[in-house]
Amino acid sequence: MSEFNVLIIGSGPAGLFTAIWLERLGVDKIAIFDRKQYSAGGLLNDGKLNFDYRVGIDLDELQIDKKEAQNLMQEVKQVFIKFPLCQQVTFIENNEKIDAWRKIAGEHNVEFIAPEQWHYGTDNGKKFVDYLRSSLVNTTFFLGTEVISIEKQDERFCFVCRKDQKRKEYFGKTVLASPGRSGAYWFRDISRKIGVNNNFGPIDVGIRVELNRKSYDSITDVVYDPKFIFHTKRHGDRVRTFCTNPGGRVRIENYDSFKLINGDALFDRKTENTNFALINTVSLTQPFSDTTEFGRMIARQFFLLGGGRPIVQRIGDFREGKRSSKSTFNSKTSHFDRCRATYNATPGDITLGLPARIVDNLWESLKTLDKIVPGILHPSTLLYAPEIKFFDTHFSTDRHLETNIDGIFVAGDGTGKSRGIVGAAISGIIAARGIAAKYFK
């Protein structure tokens, strides 16, 4: 069959939740396209869930208020907690320890956010995706299928696709684009060809910090993924911690022409380390405002400097202004053996690839964090680069996430509508309700 009601790009949380809610609203003949052989984007990486309207969504971007956001989060939560392997890891009700950490952070002019959090782990990612897919009865998946172009033909849209070197066309009344972070650059270009308006928003650029788990247990035993938000004194820029993984691993994200650093945690097997991202929000104006290309330039530079791999540097070396090297990387004399790397990155100097302003901001924030949680700056602590979050392409939409082209809706991280699994799922629900109400009453 090549005729559908809704054509969905991307099988991540935004795409899947759009399909689930469309079916609940009585819409059938749904198709999901993904160039990967297995769905489903961010759902396969770690499975960390933050249920707090201050994390993962922008109320103004989604044109909803706090109450609407909380209601949507409850709807998303009900889907996740029915999965048996998804467990709550941060309890916020009447938690005096959270209040104590908030007070300590406040003494250093740092904002501290402790959301209700659940986790199912990378090792359970495919099981969770299968659990979601099992609820879909009127949705067809086209995996390993690349969408080459989108065309408007009369009152319907045409996807020109390629699979196994063969081309085929699929038609639909409406389109939901949720390309994910890895597909953001591609969809930005392909959408412009059919007249969809988009612009550049801020991008997050930084590092992943890995340290001996004991140095961070005091906070992660209370809040699994603590959120610290800094505003630097020197430049007045925003830096935040993100995606903390107690007992986790450092991993990579593969893109077409570079690799980015990331981190995750398994449900059943833990390491002796903890890792978290420390990222600087960057906005650009004239004459160069393309934050996507800015991030890609940094990523490609690290790809060259690291010989095809991300770069890692010990804080002990960083403080002395020298690069890390293989010969001394695990030196007992320098106390580097306290934290063994969980990913084989290239030892080097992260300051060669990051702009000086970003390095200044990250270092200032690390020093402040060490005052809140002493032990962060142990010489053995590892700094991996680059960690870049491509949430930066923004699409102008109405409150149902429909673009300026009738029938084309967007959702998820890759279109600037969310930052993380829960936010992506929420944007998918909003889009599904908009599609059903306008086109399938």
Listing of model-derived features with the role each one plays in the protein:
Residues 2-57, 61, 96-441:
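Residues forming the flavin
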Residues 41-91:
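Dinucleotide-binding Rossmann-like beta1-alpha1 core, especially the glycine-rich loop
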